[in-house]
Amino acid sequence: MHLKIVLAFLALSLITIFALAYVLLTSPGGSSQPPHCPSVSHRAQPWPHPGQSQLFADLSREELTAVMRFLTQRLGPGLVDAAQAQPSDNCIFSVELQLPPKAAALAHLDRGSPPPAREALAIVLFGGQPQPNVSELVVGPLPHPSYMRDVTVERHGGPLPYHRRPVLRAEFTQMWRHLKEVELPKAPIFLSSTFNYNGSTLAAVHATPRGLRSGDRATWMALYHNISGVGLFLHPVGLELLLDHRALDPAHWTVQQVFYLGHYYADLGQLEREFKSGRLEVVRVPLPPPNGASSLRSRNSPGPLPPLQFSPQGSQYSVQGNLVVSSLWSFTFGHGVFSGLRIFDVRFQGERIAYEVSVQECVSIYGADSPKTMLTRYLDSSFGLGRNSRGLVRGVDCPYQATMVDIHILVGKGAVQLLPGAVCVFEEAQGLPLRRHHNYLQNHFYGGLASSALVVRSVSSVGNYDYIWDFVLYPNGALEGRVHATGYINTAFLKGGEEGLLFGNRVGERVLGTVHTHAFHFKLDLDVAGLKNWVVAEDVVFKPVAAPWNPEHWLQRPQLTRQVLGKEDLTAFSLGSPLPRYLYLASNQTNAWGHQRGYRIQIHSPLGIHIPLESDMERALSWGRYQLVVTQRKEEESQSSSIYHQNDIWTPTVTFADFINNETLLGEDLVAWVTASFLHIPHAEDIPNTVTLGNRVGFLLRPYNFFDEDPSIFSPGSVYFEKGQDAGLCSINPVACLPDLAACVPDLPPFSYHGF
């Protein structure tokens, strides 16, 4: 009996041990289930930032609502919601942050003065007046507005004619309705026989500008096959119509001309009559298949996922509203409704490097033998680089663990809109050493630092193109601005013959990928060790010198040249002209070695091409003449372009070339303006989409004697070990810690998407 008790006790003990082992092994702390990685690094010590200033933060939902309520009360009951407004109505088109004057902002940030009043800029379309116009109103102070002032003349030198207004949704809708209900019924047999049109299988793509002279509002509209899930931009049918929609009453709109296969007609009725009589040359265009070449559906079944980047010790940055802080950098980002991504008060180790770095404009100019394409000059700020940024996809548009930030906007409708995930912030591991050296002469050692950067990103989907905007901040104090282009190409119908190939490559059965240029303009308001800066150009020349130890032999010795560019005209480097290989903004402070502290500007852009100066559209695009210009900073020269240029490109409200008037640049607050551009000749590999690879341009700001040494040497991730040391020890080499530190599960948020 005693033996049975002992055996039973042993059996019970074994069961208990197995049960405990199972619990330990399967619990979150057990070896089979590693712990979750921290979301924020406990070692990250954000650099102190002077308060949580709201100077540059985009307007909140509450502020936008307060401005709308105030304007509705002040402007009276005649206002119509912009989403339904007809051309003859009054409506509030947009509301966004009015940036404060720089002097007042710096007084608050640097000297503790009260913050300047927080204000909004509203654009109001007055179509219901005897003399319709566009007005710009500043409203403040927020969040409880009590005043508004008209700044139209102050900002633009005079009133804004009504024909310059952006096209509202209701006008776009009415334009297509006019074609569908008034014009297309004039050619039912031609349309159904030639394009298989059934009332819903065609859509229009517009040319801009809308006319040929100031005051016009007439748009060439090219028809494309429109099938769900298929990129309509790749399916032109060859039919284009010129719609005059200048009249405020859509009942008075008319089609002035029709273009088909190289010929112009009075209207679709004439086209129908010639088709019925058999005199019309036609090319029948079948409907595209749903899963054809223009579809972005994968041609393969799902396979292994791409590599996942994660931070085993947690993020090295934090996002608080619009403020981003890390152990090295701090800045505030903004998201202009029209101009898009911008950053302010950019500081490295607490010292301001830049007051503002921002996108100004994005233009593409097309060529082909159809009227819609040959006229097209898209100025994308007018469509809204910011308003068209939304729905970034985790794991594709941004790393999966990126911080996704929602943006509130008010444009084109009377209610506040949420742009979910319009901006993302993340750390970028670049798979490259920022610096390294393996020494084997005299002694043996290795030192290096893996390159990583802090990135803020938005993506503007403007019509067919998608522009990926990044501002990238590095541990050595460098700041990069870059843009990648992707999306669908714009196409024209290819009639046949070699003449069509003067404007691009054939990319489909009857499809021409049309040649075009891209140009992007950036504003760099740098404050290099203060507000007083100089522009310095350095280069090298070879000079002959007799070898001192043997004068019979001559050497060609490189020698530095240095020039202070003291006037604006000296810094206006035309597109295509050579830039000094080193050009930097210098301060009146010196580093430990007696050199002026500076920041160098490098432009990453192939040799561009600008529209000829004799073009009557050129002055509105005059910023594109220059790859680089440095000017005195002025509040009245805050932007290089205007949203009103798209619909009146012949009478610009802002002419950037006029900023350059040979003023002194010696010890002044300076702004550098950078143009980055490239040529795109579409080809077969642009189908279905243009890839980002090879379609990237931008600029780089690099410290030049700003520090006494490379500040990245203080990075905690630096690696150094010598011969004889055990590089596998964590105490010697921080990279050796990774197998233990990375033994955690990334804390991944569930995937969600709200971009539609």
Swiss-Prot record:
The chain crosses the membrane at residues 5-25. It comes from Homo sapiens. This is Amine oxidase [copper-containing] 2. Keywords: Calcium, Catecholamine metabolism, Cell membrane, Copper, Cytoplasm, Disulfide bond, Glycoprotein, Membrane, Metal-binding, Oxidoreductase, Signal-anchor, TPQ, Transmembrane, Transmembrane helix. Topaquinone (TPQ) is generated by copper-dependent autoxidation of a specific tyrosyl residue. Induction: Up-regulated during in vitro adipocyte differentiation. It holds the Pfam family Cu_amine_oxid. Residues 26-756 are extracellular. Residues 1-4 are cytoplasmic. Ca(2+) 2 binds at E568, E637, F659, N661, E663. Cu(2+) binds at H516, H518, H680. Homodimer; disulfide-linked. Probably forms heterodimers with AOC3. PROSITE patterns: COPPER_AMINE_OXID_1, COPPER_AMINE_OXID_2. Ca(2+) 1 binds at D525, L526, D527, D669, L670. GO terms for cellular component: cytoplasm; plasma membrane. Disulfide bonds join C398-C424, C730-C737. It catalyses: 2-phenylethylamine + O2 + H2O = 2-phenylacetaldehyde + H2O2 + NH4(+); tryptamine + O2 + H2O = indole-3-acetaldehyde + H2O2 + NH4(+); tyramine + O2 + H2O = (4-hydroxyphenyl)acetaldehyde + H2O2 + NH4(+). Belongs to the copper/topaquinone oxidase family. The active site is at D380, Y465. The lineage of its organism: Eukaryota, Metazoa, Chordata, Craniata, Vertebrata. GO terms for biological process: amine metabolic process; catecholamine metabolic process; visual perception; xenobiotic metabolic process.
